[in-house]
Regions:
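The substrate-binding groove and active-site-proximal loops of carbohydrate-active enzymes
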Residues: 98-104, 130-135, 223, 251
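Anion (oxyanion) recognition and catalysis
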Residues: 65, 149, 463
Length: 481
């Protein structure tokens, strides 16, 4: 199979959670990339930790497109079946949200789906090419489950349909978990289920639920019920991307059991390797640990906006760290990002767009950026490459062209935001200058009338404004201090 090259001829490498190494990225079909993203469970607002994952997935998609690849990206919306333990126990999260807000499940799903899309727009996250809610694919779920039963990878017990993990040569792929990790009470959310043949088995379809008020149910060959969480991503991916998937993305907390179970059921169904590359983004942490809705400790984009933060500053904050490193959020750290952001915009605003682009210099400086991104999507070094452009010995037109080029991937709207900054500052500077000049004229008049006390008072006013004045033979000169 031919290798897919970046614009300068080197091969992009991505850390693959499946192999635990940086692997050369080679799509199954030359020139085309199939990419699947685990979407939100829309029972509440996405917190900024969730959104860090979507930001980094967005950067990956945009960089693949930047290199000339044809990317088709698919994402699910979980609006049924995701239980609170991420396994097969606890309350359905959608039902939990509906009870909390005294609304129907579909009302909750619509509201929080729209809220998620709004957050993505604020953060310059491109929505995937295909977005499919789980409730729209019930027929596909049933078809795959029937096939798994026929192949003896699934069984019925106690009214539910379970996947039989004992049929697999290997189950634990992303971790070092052993059987005892699934013992009752050892891992959070693991509860006893006498219907399972093996502790690692998981539900494909529920007909017997401990929730009598489960709102969403469908007819199936096994009775009225609803799908398990894990089956939806496999089915939605295969529905739109086929039996071979290049990249599967998600947060690291989804690696087990969700992604592990996806691989199990998908490969049992298709009979061959399903996905070649697994891209996992690490947690956003606070001083109290991982940000989590279940703990009731989470921040939203809207809350950051209420506190005066531009959502793009949060994106910038995320890009300054590598996706495989846990990122510590604090307002102090975000304020540091604000300071760096404002300085960056101020430098961009000073660039003169007139002139011709130096193509040789453009390609030379671009190499720093593509080297960074080819090396496991190193956005931290990618941002450094941006700063190197500003310091480079080349003309402003070339610098602006490079900034615009890098921003196809970084999506920080740097030139647009810098233009806003310049437009805001210019009238303020004119107003400030006019006020200073008026005070200097008043001081000159006071000195001419030998009213030195008034002249000293005006000097004090100017000092409080951050202005230093000097009397010279040519007149008064002033500068900010």
């Amino acid at each position: 199979m031919p290798q897919i090259l970046s614009p300068k001829g080197t091969i992009m490498k991505l850390y693959n959670s499946l192999t635990r190494t940086k692997d050369e990225f080679i799509p199954h079909e030359p020139g085309k990339v199939s990419m699947y993203t685990c979407g939100p469970t829309v029972y509440h607002f996405a917190h900024i930790g969730n959104l860090r994952t979507y930001i980094m997935e967005d950067v990956l998609e945009k960089y693949l497109r930047y290199t000339g690849l044809d990317v088709k990206r698919v994402m699910n919306i979980t609006d049924v079946g995701h239980l609170s333990s991420d396994a097969d126990t606890g309350e359905d999260k959608m039902l939990k949200g509906a009870k909390r807000e005294k609304k129907t499940v579909m009302e909750i799903a619509k509201f929080y789906t729209d809220a998620f899309f709004a957050d993505c727009e604020k953060l310059n996250i491109k929505l995937p090419d295909v977005i499919e809610p789980a409730t729209g694919c019930i027929d596909e779920f049933i078809k795959v489950i029937e096939a798994l039963i026929e192949k003896e990878y699934a069984y019925e017990a106690g009214g539910n349909i379970y996947f039989d993990t004992s049929k697999l040569k290997q189950y634990y792929l992303f971790n070092n978990f052993e059987e005892e990790d699934l013992q009752d009470g050892v891992r959070e959310g693991v509860e006893k289920d006498d219907n399972k043949r093996n502790k690692a088995d998981f539900v494909l379809w529920f007909t017997k639920s401990k929730f009598d008020d489960q709102e969403l149910k469908w007819n199936s060959p096994w009775g009225i019920g609803y799908p398990g969480w894990h089956i939806e991503c496999s089915c939605i991916s295969m529905k739109h991307l086929g039996e071979y998937l290049d990249i599967h993305c998600g947060g690291i907390d989804n690696a087990f059991p969700h992604h592990t179970n996806e691989i199990a059921q998908s490969e049992a169904y298709v009979g061959h390797k399903w996905c070649n590359y697994w891209f996992h983004v690490l947690h956003l942490n606070t001083n109290g640990g991982k940000m989590s809705k279940s703990k009731g400790e989470f921040l939203t984009v809207s809350l950051l906006e209420e506190k005066g933060y531009n959502p793009l500053v949060y994106r910038f904050f995320c890009l300054q760290s590598h996706y495989r490193k846990s990122l510590v959020f604090s307002y102090e750290n975000l304020d540091n990002a604000v300071a760096a952001w404002e300085k960056l915009l101020a430098r961009v605003a000073k660039l003169d767009k007139n002139g011709d682009v130096d193509n040789a210099k453009f390609e030379e400086l671009k190499r720093d950026f593509t080297d960074a991104m080819d090396n496991d999507l190193n956005t931290s070094l990618g941002v450094t490459a941006l700063y190197n452009v500003l310091k480079a010995d080349t003309n402003d037109a070339t610098k602006l062209a490079l900034i615009a080029d890098f921003d196809k991937v970084l999506s920080l709207n740097l030139i647009e935001e810098a233009s806003k900054l310049g437009a805001q500052e210019e009238p303020l500077d004119d107003e400030f200058t006019a006020k200073v000049e008026a005070l200097i004229a008043e001081r000159a008049a006071a000195k001419k009338e030998k009213n030195f006390a008034e002249a000293d008072r005006i000097r004090g006013v100017l000092t409080e404004m951050g202005v230093e004045i000097k009397d010279t033979r040519e007149g008064v000169v002033w500068q900010r201090i």
